[in-house]
């Protein structure tokens, strides 16, 4: 039997797909955006999806839809919205309603009591307000929880990882926070890939260890057709939205 996951801020289901390849199964996913939910249904057929604002969704409802009780989930996974911590935004942190969604994530963890949780967010979370936001998040996530007469507490580990160091053709630094109620610190995996320069300097490195490139990932695709008028119009609309997004 596969280990059950509660997926929060699921987006298109990228984390879910990754964990499914590691032997886990998403029991319930929570996502507000209708387009993301439509994509989720394609990527995760048969998975129960709660479409709505997590501020208005109780942990009891999440567990009920996922057909679980507290202590039964193996994992809670997700990446709460990162705009309030992003170096590219106004960086309002926990003063931004979106920043407070991190606390909603922790609320679901504390009330569902999974064996472990994995949270992903932008690197900027580590230095917002001289690290006070991260300290507040870690303090809240590690506090003692009393359930059914027993006390539980999550042991936390965090690290800033770059996806390019693990075979992804993209420089993408993210903080990964892992907590477990077993009491053991999580050891993050060592990088599997290095820069071409490092590979050349180390005789024991092979070509498979070098950073992957975009060509490695999509070089075998057939040539793209000429864009249609519809595609060009949509592209212009998206560009205007990016310019005027207000962050």
Model-derived segments and spans:
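Short C-terminal domain-edge/linker segments immediately following a structured domain
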Residues: 38, 60, 106-111, 146-152, ...
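S-adenosyl-L-methionine-dependent DNA methyltransferase catalytic core
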Residues: 2-26, 71, 140-144, 170-247
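Generic structural "secondary-structure junction" signal
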Residues: 56-59, 87, 96, 124-127, ...
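Core alpha/beta nucleotide-donor-binding catalytic domains of modification enzymes
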Residues: 2-113, 123-136, 142
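Conserved Class I SAM-dependent methyltransferase catalytic core
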Residues: 100-181
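Secondary-structure boundary/capping residues
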Residues: 49-50, 114, 150, 227
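Generic beta-strand hydrophobic packing signal
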Residues: 27-29, 76, 117, 159, ...
């Amino acid at each position: 039997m596969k280990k059950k996951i509660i997926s929060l801020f699921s987006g298109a289901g990228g984390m879910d797909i990754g964990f499914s390849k590691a032997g886990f199964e998403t029991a319930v996913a929570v996502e507000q955006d209708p387009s993301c939910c439509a994509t989720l249904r394609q990527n995760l057929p048969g998975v129960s999806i709660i479409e709505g604002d997590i501020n208005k969704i109780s942990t009891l409802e999440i567990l009920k839809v996922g057909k679980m009780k507290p202590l039964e989930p193996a994992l809670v996974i997700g990446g709460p919205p990162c705009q309030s911590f992003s170096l590219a935004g106004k960086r309002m942190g926990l003063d931004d309603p979106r920043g407070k969604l991190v606390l909603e994530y922790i609320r679901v963890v504390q009330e569902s009591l999974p064996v472990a949780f994995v949270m992903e967010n932008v690197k900027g979370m580590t230095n917002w307000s001289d690290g006070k936001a991260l300290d507040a998040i870690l303090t809240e996530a590690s506090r003692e929880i009393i359930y059914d007469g027993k006390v539980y507490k999550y042991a936390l580990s965090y690290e800033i990882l770059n996806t390019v160091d693990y075979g992804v053709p993209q420089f993408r630094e993210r903080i990964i926070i892992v907590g477990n109620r077993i009491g053991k610190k999580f050891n993050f995996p060592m990088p599997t890939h290095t820069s071409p320069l490092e590979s050349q300097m180390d005789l024991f490195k092979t070509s498979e260890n070098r950073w992957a490139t975009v060509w490695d990932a999509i070089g075998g695709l057939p040539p793209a057709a000429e864009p249609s008028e519809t595609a060009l119009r949509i592209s212009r609309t998206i560009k205007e939205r990016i310019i005027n997004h207000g962050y």
